[in-house]
């Protein structure tokens, strides 16, 4: 069986390793970054490191005779997931989604919003805002909140892009997920009274950001996940692997 694993996330690497252990499976792994692609080399027969539009995805599926597509992209990679669902339907192949569990936390100082524009408009009232939601929506947030009021934590690979938006002293370049304590100290050190984050789930360090902010006495604005009606969806990796193993029989 030939399987395409759309990844670039921590979860996708764990899924890939467990799929490899099933044996008798050709794994094609896709990631939008070189770093994500290197992680895929541990378990995949073939790695593609570039964003694929709908037509490119279709051609890749045809070229490698893919039987099943496992979408383990980030919960906010909505266009990639929509394209994958449509292409699988057109080509009549199985689409399976893995998505981290949502972690709704109820607290008077936590506000849930639908998108980053709403988040930025709410954050505009703050004295200083810590943007903990990656590079993609940083410019929009800065444009609305104000350049002098935003601190942004980004991946080291995104620093050059961030420097086009903010001065160096307002950029924190770090890789990984971080403890509640580290998040708390960063928020305090930069005197931020609001953070913007997104519901990225357990492996995205969501709880550690939220509780770190609350302990630093900062308000938390959380951008909710986009809602997609997935044909088949798992939030447990072992259950996903069992499902695919049964398809192989």
From Swiss-Prot:
EC no.? 1.3.1.106
Q: What is this protein called?
A: Cobalt-precorrin-6A reductase
The record's keywords, sorted A to Z, are:
Cobalamin biosynthesis, NAD, Oxidoreductase
Q: Which reaction does it catalyse?
A: Co-precorrin-6B + NAD(+) = Co-precorrin-6A + NADH + H(+)
Q: What does this protein do?
A: Catalyzes the reduction of the macrocycle of cobalt-precorrin-6A to cobalt-precorrin-6B.
Protein family per UniProt: Belongs to the precorrin-6x reductase family.
Q: Which GO terms describe its molecular function?
A: precorrin-6A reductase activity
* Matches recorded under NCBIfam families: precor6x_red
Its UniProt pathway annotation is:
Cofactor biosynthesis; adenosylcobalamin biosynthesis; cob(II)yrinate a,c-diamide from sirohydrochlorin (anaerobic route): step 7/10
What GO biological process terms are annotated to this protein in UniProt? cobalamin biosynthetic process
Gene field: cbiJ
Q: Which InterPro entries match?
A: Precorrin-6x_reduct
């Amino acid at each position: 069986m030939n399987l395409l694993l759309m990844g670039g996330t921590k979860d996708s690497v764990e899924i890939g390793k467990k799929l490899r252990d099933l044996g008798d499976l050709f794994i094609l792994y896709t990631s939008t970054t070189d770093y994500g692609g290197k992680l895929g080399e541990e378990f995949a027969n073939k790695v593609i490191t570039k964003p694929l539009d709908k037509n490119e995805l279709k051609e890749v599926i045809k070229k490698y005779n893919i039987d099943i597509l496992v979408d383990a992209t980030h919960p906010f990679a909505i266009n990639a997931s929509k394209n994958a669902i449509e292409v699988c339907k057109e080509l009549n192949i199985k689409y399976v989604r893995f998505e981290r569990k949502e972690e709704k936390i109820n607290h008077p100082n936590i506000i849930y919003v639908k998108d980053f524009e709403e988040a930025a408009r709410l954050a505009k009232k703050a004295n200083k805002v810590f943007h903990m939601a990656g590079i993609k929506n940083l410019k929009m947030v800065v444009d609305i909140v104000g350049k002098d009021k935003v601190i942004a934590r980004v991946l080291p690979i995104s620093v050059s892009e961030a420097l086009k938006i903010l001065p160096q002293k307002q950029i924190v370049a770090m890789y990984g997920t971080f403890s509640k304590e580290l998040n708390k100290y960063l928020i305090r050190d930069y005197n931020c009274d609001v953070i913007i984050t997104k519901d990225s789930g357990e492996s995205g360090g969501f709880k550690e950001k939220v509780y770190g902010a609350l302990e630093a006495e900062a308000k938390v604005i959380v951008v909710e996940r986009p809602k997609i009606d997935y044909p088949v969806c798992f939030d447990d990796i072992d259950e996903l692997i069992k499902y695919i193993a049964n398809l192989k029989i």
